[in-house]
């Protein structure tokens, strides 16, 4: 048992002290590193400050592996962050999913979150739609309608549909989505990122209750947002 505990501790330390960097981040890391070298030629302390910023940039674009639950019917969080809003809202009109409200879970990502986004369920991408817009604070409810966004509609093998939306914010002004119409994806699969903090909304099928609460910290590719096959009602929670 002691040996297993030591091994688990070593794995945990490795996870936090070493992390892969997403390929989207390498150009930024390179620019920060070059800037640090140039600043160091001007004045040593400036070079050290640039080196710290380079390390921060590398950490920002970290892309750790995740252990994704594989049971059918689970809806997995597409983003790291905090549950900002939970409620009934109609999906974006560009997805052609009708005007009827669906349960929406909004996950806010700060500049300290991992910004790699992941698919919430297994299925087929039905439609991807980019919409330019404003860059309001992503924590505002109206950001879902007014801000730049990438909306994705997907269908499971049983025909039930889920939508998720990448929303730009005050700082985040670059949404990247690698998905294409007709593409087959798996839950937990990486599909894109939003640079420097923002929000991802998930729209559940009719009659499905959320299994997360407002203010809850969640992890992309690991935290279960909902269970499509469960009859459990919406979970309640409070900050303690």
Curated annotation (Swiss-Prot):
Protein name (record): Phosphatidylserine decarboxylase proenzyme
Active site, UniProt feature: 198
Chief place of localization: membrane
One Gene Ontology biological process: phosphatidylethanolamine biosynthetic process
InterPro entries: PS_Dcarbxylase, PSD-A
Organism: Paramagnetospirillum magneticum (strain ATCC 700264 / AMB-1) (Magnetospirillum magneticum)
Gene: psd
Mod. after translation: Is synthesized initially as an inactive proenzyme. Formation of the active enzyme involves a self-maturation process in which the active site pyruvoyl group is generated from an internal serine residue via an autocatalytic post-translational modification. Two non-identical subunits are generated from the proenzyme in this reaction, and the pyruvate is formed at the N-terminus of the alpha chain, which is derived from the carboxyl end of the proenzyme.
Similarity section: Belongs to the phosphatidylserine decarboxylase family. PSD-A subfamily.
